[in-house]
């Protein structure tokens, strides 16, 4: 399913807004970026030292548009996959293991 960049960014913002309130203050410093394509076929990528580190790289989460478009065949499915990806990458920020991810 193909969507405009603006529509995809809307889905990403909706996902960010769905982060539980108790975590929001810890993710305010994360830079969320939308990229067109992932050379590795990733849905998302977390880069940073994690929320428990006092100093380190500034945290950045990249969400890849084309990979999500290939994974979904409806707008609703795309929005849900973006939400899962954002929460998954935020989980990495909190140093969570795969089984602990908040989705």
Predicted regions and their residues:
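Short secondary-structure boundary micro-motifs
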Residues: 1, 15-17, 75-77
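Short alpha-helical functional segments enriched in proximate histidine and acidic residues
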Residues: 18, 22, 85, 89-93
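Auxiliary, metal-adjacent structural segments of Zn-dependent hydrolase domains
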Residues: 10-11, 16-62
């Amino acid at each position: 399913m193909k969507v405009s960049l603006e529509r995809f960014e809307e889905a990403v913002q909706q996902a960010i807004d769905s982060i539980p309130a108790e975590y929001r203050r810890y993710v305010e410093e994360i830079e969320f970026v939308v990229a067109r394509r992932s050379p590795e076929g990733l849905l998302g990528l977390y880069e940073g030292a994690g929320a428990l580190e006092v100093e380190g790289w500034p945290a950045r989460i990249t969400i890849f548009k084309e990979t999500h478009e290939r994974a979904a065949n409806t707008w609703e499915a795309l929005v849900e996959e973006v939400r899962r990806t954002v929460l998954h990458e935020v989980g990495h920020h909190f140093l969570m293991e795969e089984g602990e991810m908040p989705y």
